[in-house]
């Protein structure tokens, strides 16, 4: 049956009433569920996890930015990494030079050698996210090669389609390239995102095949929310929702106790994100264009990264 007018409004109000009073509670409930019901599984890193398959959360971007508050999230890292992706860079040292060392372990000499990439320079991650976003299908040589005009620029294609055909159901960017997987230091965890335009708002849904709930997921939520803000800004839209779909949602066994501490904390209001100048193209964004206002998180909780 077609739902129109007041019926549609009633449905929207019901959905709103069912949503938690604070978006962060969705994340905390996911963590609680995994701790309570997760299956114990071995994993690539040898650390061990509690895991469930299939979770989803919806974060409003309309008047707030979902930077979690029950612990401090590394905002500088979120911003610098996303700009690094947008550049198409696959050089971990480039990011590290800006004080963001989240890719250092995967680009280390020992790690690359363990994967059989002995001929590759240290820091060369292979055709990971940025390469797939901007040069999908091009032949990867090394992190220093110039790939201008090679492959499919998925990110620009997303932006162009939003501008010219916003009702298109194919506004998709995919980092999962089976041909290139053997060349990557780490295959994509956040594999595919789709954009959706309605009533002047831009929403994004991410499919994340693998979600490290302690360290990775808070970072990923903020990263794709930021990407949505950036694309909305360029295309003259307002940010709508970020829908986060998880495949294997897991908690590393050495993160259980830190996450129990986090669960005891009450979420504080999400901050706001301001873009400080008019930016015309996705490649023109700079670190200084963004300002987070009203971010008052609980203290940092230390968790070790599984490599």
Swiss-Prot record:
It comes from the Eukaryota. (6R)-5,10-methylene-5,6,7,8-tetrahydrofolate binds at residues 212, 306. It is found in: Nucleus; Cytoplasm; Mitochondrion; Mitochondrion matrix. The active site is at 189 (nucleophile). Its EC number is 2.1.1.45. Keywords: Cytoplasm, Isopeptide bond, Membrane, Methyltransferase, Mitochondrion, Mitochondrion inner membrane, Nucleotide biosynthesis, Nucleus, Phosphoprotein, Transferase, Ubl conjugation. There is a cross-link at residues 286, 302 (Glycyl lysine isopeptide (Lys-Gly) (interchain with G-Cter in SUMO2)). The modification Phosphoserine is found at residue 108. Signal peptide: none annotated. It catalyses: dUMP + (6R)-5,10-methylene-5,6,7,8-tetrahydrofolate = 7,8-dihydrofolate + dTMP. GO terms for cellular component: cytoplasm; mitochondrial inner membrane; mitochondrial matrix; mitochondrion; nucleus. DUMP binds at residues 44, 169-170, 189-190, 209-212, 220, 250-252. GO terms for molecular function: mRNA regulatory element binding translation repressor activity; sequence-specific mRNA binding; thymidylate synthase activity. Pathway: Pyrimidine metabolism; dTTP biosynthesis. GO terms for biological process: dTMP biosynthetic process; dTTP biosynthetic process; methylation; tetrahydrofolate interconversion. InterPro entries: Thymidate_synth/dCMP_Mease, Thymidate_synth/dCMP_Mease_dom, Thymidate_synth/dCMP_Mease_sf, Thymidylate_synthase, Thymidylate_synthase_AS. Its main location: nucleus. NCBIfam families: PRK01827.1-3, thym_sym. Belongs to the thymidylate synthase family. This is Thymidylate synthase. The lineage of its organism: Eukaryota, Metazoa, Chordata, Craniata, Vertebrata. The gene is Tyms.
């Amino acid at each position: 049956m077609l739902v129109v007018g007041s019926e549609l409004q009633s449905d929207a109000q019901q959905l709103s009433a069912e949503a938690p009073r604070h978006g962060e509670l969705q994340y905390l409930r996911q963590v609680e569920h995994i701790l309570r019901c997760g299956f114990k599984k071995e994993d690539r890193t040898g650390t061990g996890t509690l895991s469930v398959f299939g979770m989803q959360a919806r974060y409003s971007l309309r008047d707030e930015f979902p930077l979690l508050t029950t612990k401090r999230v590394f905002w500088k890292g979120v911003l610098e990494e996303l700009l690094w992706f947008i550049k198409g860079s696959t050089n971990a040292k480039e990011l590290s030079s800006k004080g963001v060392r989240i890719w250092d372990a995967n680009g280390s000499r020992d790690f690359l050698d363990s994967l059989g990439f002995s001929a590759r320079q240290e820091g060369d991650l292979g055709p990971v996210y940025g390469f797939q976003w901007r040069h999908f299908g091009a032949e990867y040589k090394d992190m220093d090669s110039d790939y201008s005009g090679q492959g499919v620029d998925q990110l620009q294609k997303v932006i162009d389609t939003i501008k010219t055909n916003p009702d298109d159901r194919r506004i998709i960017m995919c980092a999962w390239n089976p041909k290139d997987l053997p060349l990557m230091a780490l295959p994509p965890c956040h594999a595919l995102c789709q954009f959706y335009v309605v009533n002047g708002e831009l929403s994004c849904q991410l499919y994340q095949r693998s979600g490290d709930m302690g360290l990775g997921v808070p970072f990923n939520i903020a990263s794709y929310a930021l990407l949505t803000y950036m694309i909305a800004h360029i295309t003259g839209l307002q940010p709508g929702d970020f829908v986060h779909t998880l495949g294997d949602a897991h908690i590393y066994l050495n993160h259980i106790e830190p996450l129990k501490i986090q669960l005891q904390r009450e979420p504080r209001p999400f901050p706001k994100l301001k873009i400080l100048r008019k930016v015309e193209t996705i490649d023109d964004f700079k670190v200084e264009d963004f300002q987070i206002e009203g971010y008052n998180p609980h203290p940092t909780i230390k968790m070790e990264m599984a490599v």
